[in-house]
Amino acid sequence: MLFENLKIRDVNLKNRVVVSPMCQYSAKDGYIQTHHKTHYGQLAMGGAGLIFLEATGVTAQGRITNGCLGIWDDKQIEGLREITQSIKVLGSIPAIQLGHAGQKASMQRPWHGNGPQTTIDTDRGDIIWEPIAPMDRPLDEGWLKPRKMERKELDEVRDAFVKASERSIEAGFEVIEIHMAHGYLLHSFLSPLSNSRNDEYGGSIENRMRFPLEVVKKVRETIGENVPLFVRISAEDGLDGGWTIEDSINFCHILKEQGV
């Protein structure tokens, strides 16, 4: 079965082998570099049916690190299109994971420590920016304190996901995935451990799901019914009082109704 073809909406996969999104931390100002062209071309030569580009920031401030790819500018489409074309030539389907790092933005690259950035990082040429999140609580002691998102910023980020999905289609990606896991922005709205807002986007589980579901709805409307839309979630927080596996099951039923 692994090597049988699979049709998902209008996309035909030659097999069911999927290369998951794996950050390369090798972009410059969010743009594709030679490393990416070599890396993804090599993956396509392996024969996988579906190949995901790494987590790609829908805004510059939504990147995990200075080395993460971005899709917030039309000028970034050209480099991304080179990747999709090379993947397609070798018979695989190109996919992209769209994300916003939220409170975990502006981190060090793994080989520089994988923690919050410091003056050591700026000395090597990286920049530090202010993260945004549902609340103004830092991820942990010593981490950058995020700015609590106002309603206007929710609208801006939602629109950024929409624009990113438009650019993804223009660049030649045939499958789109929204990143809602690992403590990044959309996951942090879902979890009661990171979201204690007192407006319509916090409190009850219905309110905490509201913003992520709004993003899904707008992206689905933008890309149409024929393009497969995936969502990556963390099954549970693994902490008392956090997001549970039962929450995930309920959420997945709702996502399916929304066209995921």
Where do the protein language model's features map onto the residues?
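Active-site glycine- and acidic-residue-rich loops that bind
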Residues: 30, 158-162, 167-169, 201-214, ...
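Alpha-helix-loop-beta-strand connector modules within alpha/beta enzyme cores
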Residues: 69-95, 190-230
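Non-globular sequence segments
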Residues: 85, 93, 99-171
